[in-house]
Amino acid sequence: MIGWGDVYKVVAATVPLYFALFLGYGSVRWWRIFTREQCDAVNRLVAFFALPFFTFEFTLHTDPFQVNYRAVAADVISKAVIVAVIGAWARFMSKGGCAVSWSITSFSLSTLTNSLVVGVPMARAMYGEWAQQLVVQLSVFQAIVWLTLLLFVLEVRKAAIGMYVDGAEAAAAAGKDVEAAGAAAAAGTVVVAAAAGKPSLWALVKVVAHKLARNPNTYASFVGITWACLANRLHIALPSAFEGSVLIMSKSGTGMAMFSMGLFMAQQEKIIACGTSFAALGLVLKFALGPAAMAIGSIAVGLRGDVLRVAIIQAALPQSITSFIFAKEYGLHADVLSTAVIFGMLVSLPLLVGFYIVLELIR
C-alpha cells in the first residue's frame, strides 16, 4: 500500500529534474547566457554523449537471465496494437508527409515512458522489489528495441526529406539548364545540361546506415546488454576505472536532458508551446491509449494478478525524456514532446495512484 513516505520518494526523485529545467529556462529567458545556436549545441551534446552513456550504464547492470519474457511479449503486442491504431488513423489523413510525421510523434507519446526516474520508486512503493525489477527490465527492453527503432525511423525521415529537397533543387537547376541550352543553341554555343533523377531506395539505405553507424545511441544499449550477458554468465565485473568513467558521464544524462528542455522552452513564446489541444492529445495518448494497449497485450499472453497490474501501471508512466531530445535533434514536434514530458510528470503521480486504486478494486 502507498504511504506518504512513498509519495515523498517519488516527489524527491522528480524535483531535481525540474530544478535542471528551471536553470535551463532561466539561462535563456532571464540571464541571456546562451544563444539559439549554443542551445542547439547543448542538445546535440546530450543526444550524442550524455544519453548514450546513461543508457549504457543502466543496461550494464541488468540481469538478462531473470527477464519476465511474458511481460516483454505483452509489451511487444501492445506496441503492435498501437501501431495498428496509428496506422488506421494515418490512412484517413489527407497529407502523406503530415501523416508520417504525426504517426512517429504519436508512437513516441503513447509508448515511450520515463521508467527509471518515476517508474522505479512508484513500482517499489506499490508492489515491492519484484515490481521494481520488472519495470527496470521493460525499461532496458525499451532502450534496446523501441528507442533504437525510433532513432531508425527518424533517420529515414530525415534522409528522405533531404533527398527530396536535393532532388527538387536538382530538377529546378536542370530546368534552368534546359532554358540556357535553348538560348545557347540559338547563339550557336554548346551547353551540357545536368540530369536530375529521383533518389533510389538504395541511396536512402546507404545514407541511413551511414548516419546510424556514426550515432553512439545505436551501440549503447546493445553493447551494454552484451556485457550484462557475459558478466552474469561468467561472474565477472568491469574494472573500477572503466566503470567510473562511464558513471561520471551517465550521471549527467537526465539532468542535462532536462536542462536542454528548459533551453528549448525559453525560446518559445508560450509555456505550452504546442497549444492546449496538442497538449491534451499527448496526455490522452500517454495515459489512455498506452495503458489500454498494454492491458490487451498482457491479457493476450496470460499475465494475471499483480504482474498484470504492474504492466498496466508502467505503461501509464510519464513521457520519456529521451523522446524529446530525439525530437529536438531531428526537428519533429519538439514542442509537443517537451509539453508531454513537463506536464506529464506533474499529473502522473495522482493518475498513477488512481490506476493503482482502480486496479486493486477489480481484483
UniProtKB/Swiss-Prot annotation:
One Pfam assignment: Mem_trans
Superkingdom as given in the UniProt entry: Eukaryota
Entry keyword set: Auxin signaling pathway, Membrane, Transmembrane, Transmembrane helix, Transport
Major subcellular location class: membrane
Record GO biological process: auxin export across the plasma membrane; auxin polar transport; auxin-activated signaling pathway
Protein localization: Membrane
GO cellular component: cell periphery; endoplasmic reticulum; plasma membrane
InterPro entries: Auxin_eff_plant (IPR014024), Auxin_Efflux_Carrier (IPR051107), Mem_transp_PIN-like (IPR004776)
Topological type in the membrane: Multi-pass membrane protein
Tissue: Expressed in leaves, shoot apex and panicles. Expressed in roots, stem bases, stems, leaves and young panicles.
Nuclease recorded as keyword: no
GO molecular function terms noted in the UniProt entry: auxin efflux transmembrane transporter activity; identical protein binding; protein homodimerization activity
TM annotation in the entry: 7-27, 39-59, 72-92, 103-123, 134-154, 222-242, 246-266, 281-301, 307-327, 342-362
Family: Belongs to the auxin efflux carrier (TC 2.A.69.1) family.
Protein purpose: May act as a component of the auxin efflux carrier.
NCBIfam families referenced in this protein's UniProt entry, alphabetically: 2a69
UniProt name for this protein: Probable auxin efflux carrier component 5a
Organism: Oryza sativa subsp. japonica (Rice)
Gene name tied to this protein: PIN5A
